[in-house]
C-alpha cells in the first residue's frame, strides 16, 4: 500500500537510520482496507527502522494484526520509497534525511550535474559524486553507506534490529554477502560470526528464533570458536583442553549435549584446520599461527651473530658519560652494552631506574659508531611515542605507523611493510599484544638490531598475549633487569613505593608527593576527586594532570560520570559555546577529548581540544587540535572515535606520564583490584600521586597478583625451537 508519514507515536523522536522499535501513523495515498475490512484514513504501523521523512511516499509491505490492547495495526516487514521521476521528486528523496551527507544544497548540486541519472549514479558509479563541490572522500563514504542502508540493505537492517545488530553493522554484512544476505541470515545464521562485531550470541539468538536445532553441528562448531574468541578478549591465546570443553558446554547450555560430543566436533575442527593445538592447549588456528610465527621470528634473531665488541662499547660509554656529565651505574652500563652488542635484547625496570637515560646513551652511541645508519624509535601509542621523542631527542612514531599498518573499516590491518632500519628501539613493550608483536618482528630486516624496553610489572596488553613477560621467561633473549632506584628529586616516593608495590609490600611511605584521602562511599569520593582535580590543574595545568579510575561506567567515580562532572567545572556551557549531541554524549567547543581508534594521522589515545564546531549542509563538524600541527575533523558517526578526556581508565593511561596523578580505588571495584593495576596507575606520575578511596581497596590490590595468568605458550615455543626437542603435542584427537 502507498502511504505517507504522518507522525511518531513511539519513541517521541528518532535520528536517521534509527534501529529502535517504532510505532508511527501514516496517511494512505490510495484506498486501504484494514483487517476488519474497513477503509482507513490513517494507518498505525509498527516495526523497526520505519521511514519518517514526510516529503516522500512509501510502498509498505507487511500484514495486519489485531490485539485486545492495541487494536488493529500494520506490522511492517519492508518498504520502498516511491520516487517521482522528476527534479522535485529526486531532490526530495536525496534530502529526505535518509541519506547522510546530503542536504538541500548538496541535493541541488547533484541533480544539476546528473539529472535523471542521479539514482543510477548512486547505484552503480557513486565515485562520480566526487566531482560535486563539497563532497569529499569521507563524505562520499557516508553517502554510500547510508544510501545502501536505505535501499539494498534495508530489509537486512530491519530484520536484524530486534536482535541488537546496529544499522552500521547490518550494512557491513550486506556489503560482505550482497544480495545473498537475507538468505544467509535466515538459513545459515551462524555464518554471521564471520563478520567482525557480530558474535556467536547474536547469531544464536537469530537461529533460535527461527527454530534451528540446538544440537546441530553448525551451532556446536561456532560455540567452540566463540569460546576461544571470548578467551582472547580476556587476554588468552589458548585454553587448556578440559577447561575449553567445559566452558563451551556452559555456553551452549543444551540438554543432551556432553563434553564427549563437543570433543568429537573439536577434533574434526582440528582436522579441518579451524582449530589448532599445542601441548594440551587449544587455539583458534589463526592465533596459533601468529604465536608460532612470533616464536620463529624471535628464534631467527637469536641465531644472528653478535652486533659488536664489548671493548669498543666500554670506550664509547665512557666518552658519552664525559659528554653528558653523567656516570652510569654498573647495571645501566650493562644495559647499554647488552643493547649495542645483541641482535635482540630486553631492558626492563620500574620508574626511576634509568630506562630513559639508557635510551639516550644507546641512541647517541649507536649514531656516532654507525654514521649513516638508519634508526627507528617507536612505541605502541601516539602518546608513548611522543614521550619517547621528547626524552631522547630522536624522532619517534607509533609501531603501526612505522609498519605502515592502517586500520580498515572493520579494524583489520593491511600487511606490514619491511622496516628500513639498522636499529629499532621499541618503548612500552608491555602494551604490545601478540598480533602487533608478530607484525613488528616479521618486519625486522635480516641483520638489524631490535631493543625492547618496558616494565614487565605493568598491566599486560589490552589485546591477547603477554609478549614481554614471555620473551623474558624463555631465558634465551639477553635481558637486563633494572631494580635500583636513582630518582632522588621531588616525587622520589613514587618510585620507592612502586618498588614496594611490585614486591607486594604494604608499608608505603606517605608525604607531600604521595598522599591518601580516605573516602568510603562513591559520592564522597567523587566530590573529593573534583576538589583535588581543580586544585592540581590550577597548579600544573590540565595537560599535566591525570585522573585515573578502574571502571568506565557503573559508578559515580567511573570515567563517564567523572568526565561529565569535571567538564562542567572546567568548560561549562555559558550559552555561547556551540556543541553537538551524539548518542548519549555532548561535545562542546573547548572540550578536552581523546581519540579511541587508530587513524592515518591520529593514534588511539591521542588527546586534543575541540577548537571549532560548525555546521555544513547536513551535519555538525568538530575540529580537534591534537598539537604538533595535527588537526582532524569529525562529523556524524566519526564522533564514535572521540571520548571526553578529563578522566581516563588506568588501562588507557599506559604509555603516558604526568606531573600529578589522581587515582580512585574503592572496594566496589572488586575484580579490578590487582597489583599490576595500581602499579601502572602510580607509575604514570612524575611528581605527585593522590589516591582517593578506601585503604582496604589499596591493600587488596597490592596483595593480589593478576587474578588469572594469561593462556599463552610463546615462551615454550621459543624454548622448543632452541632445543629442537618436540613437545607433548596432540595428535589432533580431542576425544581422547
Q: Where are the model-predicted features located?
A:
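Loop/turn positions that initiate beta-strands
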Residues: 55-59, 590, 605
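P-loop (Walker A) phosphate-binding loop of NTP-binding proteins
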Residues: 339, 350, 380, 550
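Conserved helicase motor core of SF1/SF2 NTP-dependent helicases
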Residues: 341, 346, 361, 365, ...
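N-terminal pre-P-loop "Q-motif" helix
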Residues: 325-341
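Conserved helicase motor core of P-loop NTPases
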Residues: 456-601, 611, 721, 729
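C-terminal accessory regions
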Residues: 606-617, 621-736
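Accessory, non-ATPase domains that flank or precede helicase/AAA+ motor cores in DNA-metabolism machines
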Residues: 1-311, 736
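Conserved lysine of the Walker
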Residues: 355
Amino acid at each position: 500500500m502507498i502511504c505517507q508519514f504522518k507522525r511518531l507515536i513511539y519513541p517521541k523522536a528518532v535520528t536517521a537510520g534509527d534501529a529502535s522499535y517504532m510505532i508511527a501513523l501514516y496517511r494512505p495515498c490510495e484506498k486501504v482496507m484494514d483487517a476488519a475490512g474497513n477503509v482507513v484514513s490513517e494507518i498505525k504501523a509498527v516495526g523497526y527502522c520505519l521511514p519518517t521523512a514526510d516529503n516522500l511516499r512509501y510502498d509498505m509491505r507487511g500484514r495486519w494484526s489485531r490485539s485486545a490492547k492495541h487494536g488493529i495495526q500494520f506490522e511492517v516487514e519492508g518498504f520502498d520509497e516511491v520516487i517521482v521521476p522528476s527534479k522535485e521528486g529526486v531532490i526530495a528523496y536525496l534530502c529526505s534525511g535518509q541519506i547522510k551527507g546530503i542536504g538541500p544544497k548538496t541535493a541541488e548540486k547533484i541533480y544539476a550535474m546528473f539529472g535523471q541519472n542521479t539514482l543510477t549514479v548512486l547505484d552503480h558509479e557513486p565515485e562520480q559524486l566526487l566531482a560535486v563541490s563539497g563532497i569529499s572522500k569521507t563524505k562520499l563514504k557516508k553517502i554510500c553507506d547510508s544510501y545502501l542502508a536505505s535501499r539494498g540493505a534495508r530489509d537486512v537492517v530491519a530484520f536484524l534490529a530486534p536482535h541488537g545488530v546496529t544499522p552500521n553493522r547490518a550494512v557491513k554484512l550486506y556489503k560482505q554477502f550482497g544480495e545473498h544476505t537475507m538468505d544467509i541470515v535466515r538459513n545459515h545464521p551462524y555464518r554471521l560470526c564471520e563478520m567482525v562485531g557480530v558474535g556467536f550470541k547474536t547469531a544464536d539468538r537469530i537461529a533460535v528464533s527461527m527454530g534451528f536445532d540446538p544440537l546441530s553441528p553448525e551451532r556446536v562448531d561456532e560455540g567452540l570458536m566463540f569460546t576461544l574468541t571470548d578467551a582472547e578478549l580476556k587476554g588468552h591465546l589458548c585454553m587448556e583442553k578440559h577447561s575449553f570443553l567445559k566452558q563451551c558446554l556452559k555456553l551452549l547450555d543444551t540438554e543432551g549435549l556432553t563434553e564427549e560430543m563437543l570433543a568429537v566436533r573439536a577434533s574434526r575442527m582440528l582436522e579441518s584446520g579451524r582449530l589448532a593445538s599445542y601441548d594440551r592447549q587449544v587455539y583458534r588456528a589463526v592465533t596459533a599461527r601468529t604465536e608460532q610465527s612470533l616464536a620463529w621470528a624471535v628464534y631467527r634473531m637469536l641465531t644472528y651473530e653478535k652486533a659488536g665488541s664489548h671493548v669498543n662499547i666500554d670506550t664509547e660509554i665512557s666518552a658519552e658519560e664525559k659528554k653528558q656529565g653523567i656516570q652510569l651505574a654498573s647495571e645501566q652500563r650493562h644495559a647499554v652494552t647488552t643493547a649495542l652488542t645483541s641482535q635482540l635484547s630486553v631492558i626492563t625496570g620500574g620508574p626511576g631506574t634509568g630506562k630513559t637515560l639508557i635510551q639516550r646513551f644507546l641512541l647517541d652511541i649507536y649514531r656516532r659508531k654507525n654514521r649513516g645508519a638508519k634508526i627507528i624509535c617507536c612505541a605502541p601509542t601516539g602518546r608513548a611515542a611522543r614521550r619517547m621523542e621528547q626524552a631522547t631527542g630522536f624522532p619517534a612514531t607509533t609501531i603501526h605507523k612505522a609498519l605502515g599498518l592502517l586500520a580498515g573499516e572493520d579494524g583489520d590491518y593491511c600487511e606490514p611493510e619491511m622496516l628500513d632500519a639498522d636499529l629499532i628501539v621499541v618503548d612500552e613493550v608491555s602494551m604490545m599484544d601478540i598480533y602487533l608483536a608478530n607484525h613488528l618482528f616479521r618486519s625486522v630486516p635480516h641483520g638489524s638490531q631490535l631493543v625492547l624496553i618496558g616494565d614487565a610489572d605493568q598491566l599486560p596488553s589490552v589485546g591477547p598475549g603477554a609478549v614481554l613477560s614471555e620473551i623474558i621467561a624463555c631465558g634465551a633473549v639477553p635481558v637486563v633487569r633494572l631494580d635500583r632506584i636513582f630518582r632522588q628529586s621531588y616525587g622520589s616516593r613514587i618510585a620507592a613505593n612502586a618498588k614496594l608495590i611490585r614486591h607486594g609490600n604494604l608499608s608505603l611511605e606517605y608525604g607531600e608527593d604521595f598522599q591518601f584521602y580516605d573516602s568510603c562511599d562513591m559520592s564522597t569520593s567523587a566530590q573529593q576527586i573534583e576538589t583535588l582535580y581543580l586544585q592540581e590543574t590550577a597548579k600544573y595545568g590540565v595537560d599535566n594532570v591525570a585522573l585515573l579510575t578502574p571502571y568506565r561506567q557503573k559508578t559515580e567515580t567511573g570515567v563517564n560520570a567523572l568526565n561529565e562532572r569535571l567538564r562542567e567545572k572546567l568548560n561549562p556551557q555559558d550559552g555561547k559555546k556551540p556543541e553537538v549531541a551524539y548518542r548519549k554524549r555532548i561535545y562542546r567547543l573547548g572540550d578536552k577529548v581523546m581519540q579511541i581508534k587508530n587513524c592515518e594521522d591520529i593514534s588511539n589515545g591521542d588527546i586534543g581540544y575541540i577548537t571549532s564546531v560548525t555546521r555544513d549542509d547536513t551535519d555538525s563538524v568538530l575540529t580537534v587540535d591534537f598539537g604538533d600541527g595535527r588537526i582532524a575533523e569529525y562529523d556524524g558517526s566519526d564522533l564514535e572515535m572521540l571520548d571526553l578526556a578529563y578522566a581516563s581508565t588506568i588501562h588507557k593511561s599506559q604509555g603516558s606520564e604526568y606531573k600529578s596523578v589522581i587515582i580512585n580505588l574503592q572496594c566496589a571495584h572488586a575484580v579490578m583490584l590487582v597489583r599490576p593495576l595500581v602499579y601502572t596507575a602510580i607509575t604514570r606520575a612524575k611528581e605527585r600521586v593522590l589516591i582517593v578511596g578506601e585503604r582496604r581497596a589499596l591493600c587488596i590490590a597490592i596483595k593480589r597478583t593478576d587474578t588469572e595468568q594469561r593462556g599463552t605458550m610463546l615462551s615454550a615455543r621459543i624454548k622448543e625451537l632452541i632445543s629442537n626437542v618436540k613437545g607433548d603435542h596432540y595428535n589432533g584427537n580431542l576425544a581422547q
